[in-house]
Regions:
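Conserved N-terminal beta1-alpha1 strand-loop-helix module at the mouth
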Residues: 1-138, 148-239
Length: 239
């Protein structure tokens, strides 16, 4: 089943709605120029609140798959290793999503806990970036299923010459499908409740990422759109 990441979470209420809807990953943006930036102190409280709520629910309702603990992902743009490491520990995050000009060595420093966002203009550029940033220890056939269930190799977003995300552009799905046949990718780029099922059918990605497509306003989620997005994404049957 396709993984779903709700990004740009800024408050506990939105986080809990996303988790209750069946979201697999929650994303927190630690890039201050972003209108969805959230301070580490706030994220720490959100993560703690989600953990407490999920623990309480799973104690009451055994084996309820709609209330499993999501992965908590920190989104960074050209931050230092020290800054990222401190925030990871302080906020108790599971993974790092890197959106800037980080080097392959920088990505590999996190030993499988990080994945790189790429915004290629063409399939040729995508292939070049993939070879540059391919994880140092890709899954072998024996552990591929397990590894693919944890994190994607890349997040594929729409190209923009200056923006690091939230471009308002739709990613080239034909290019994305070519990449998704070879590597587990997270598809981003103007996904909404109305187009995510079509995108999954066309691309067959490891997962899908949404932020503005489920917002009431920048930094605040529309709860009904969150539920509709997750339902639409999870409703696509995968071979």
């Amino acid at each position: 089943m396709t993984k779903v990441k709700i990004c740009g979470i800024t408050n506990l209420e939105d986080a809990l709605v996303a988790v209750q809807a069946g979201t697999d990953l929650l994303g927190f943006i630690f890039y201050e120029p972003s209108p969805r930036y959230v301070a580490p102190e706030v994220v720490r409280d959100i993560v703690s609140g989600v953990r407490c709520q999920v623990s309480r629910v799973t104690c009451q309702v055994s084996r309820d798959s709609s209330h499993t603990l999501p992965k908590f992902v920190g989104v960074f743009v050209n931050a230092s290793l020290e800054t990222i490491g401190q925030i990871l520990d302080y906020c108790q995050l599971d993974a790092v999503q890197l959106h800037g000009e980080e080097t392959p060595e920088f990505v590999n420093h996190f030993q499988g806990r990080a994945f790189k966002a790429i915004r290629p203009q063409s399939l040729e550029e995508a292939e070049r970036l993939i070879q540059k940033y391919l994880p140092a220890s890709p899954p072998t056939p024996s552990n591929a299923k397990r590894s693919h269930s944890l994190l994607p190799y890349f997040l594929l977003d729409a190209y923009h010459p200056s923006l690091y995300g939230g471009t308002g552009h739709v990613t080239d799905w034909t290019m994305a499908a070519n990449i998704a046949r070879q590597y587990p990718i997270m598809l981003a780029g103007s996904l909404t409740p109305s187009n995510v099922a079509v995108a999954i059918q066309a691309v067959k990605p490891w997962g899908v990422d949404v932020s503005s497509g489920v917002e009431a306003e920048k930094g605040r989620k529309d709860h009904e759109k969150v539920r509709e997005f997750v339902k639409a994404a999870k409703g696509v049957k995968r071979e």
